[in-house]
Amino acid sequence: SAAMGPNDSSLSTQVGGVDLTYKWKPLEHNTYKSFTWQSEIFYAKVQKTENIQVNSLGLYSLMSLQIAKRSFITARYNYAQDVNAPAAVLMAYSATYGWLATEFQKIELEGKMTEQPNHSQTYEAWLRWIFVIGTHGAHQY
């Protein structure tokens, strides 16, 4: 997809992106195994002044592997250039273990390392409880 239009400087900005997804499930035992690989890339071209144009890029790629009926592991990579300073790059790596407690609840444990544009690193750990309320695809109400 793509879009273009005027920006704050009354000049033009163009943005675009492409998303690719691959999903695999075996014909047999397909409630116990699956694999998804999803990647997306974004591009921005911003005309700041008549003489200054800034181009920036961002992307992510993730792979998710179902290792049991209710368990998944996921790895993700992020890359982003600052739209105002493309030399400033942020990169992040994460790994997640997810468990489907029920069809309405998912519990995830995630570790993430982010490398800031100044090359400092931050480390995070998250425990998430995701729950669904209301109408969903499994039941018609």
Located regions from the model:
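Surface-exposed beta-loop-beta
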Residues: 1-56
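Glycine/serine-rich loop-strand microenvironments at binding/catalytic pocket rims
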Residues: 1-13, 17, 60-66, 71-73, ...
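Transmembrane beta-strands of outer-membrane beta-barrel pores
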Residues: 2-6, 24, 41-47, 77-83, ...
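Residues that define the transmembrane beta-barrel architecture of outer-membrane proteins
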Residues: 12-18, 53-59, 89-93, 121-125
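Transmembrane beta-strands of outer-membrane beta-barrel proteins
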Residues: 18, 33-39, 73-75, 95, ...
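Outer-membrane beta-barrel "beta-signal"
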Residues: 18-20, 99-101, 121-141
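Short loop/turn motifs that connect adjacent beta-strands in outer-membrane beta-barrel proteins
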Residues: 26-35, 70, 104, 135-141
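Outer membrane beta-barrel transmembrane domains
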Residues: 50-51, 64-66, 70-112, 141
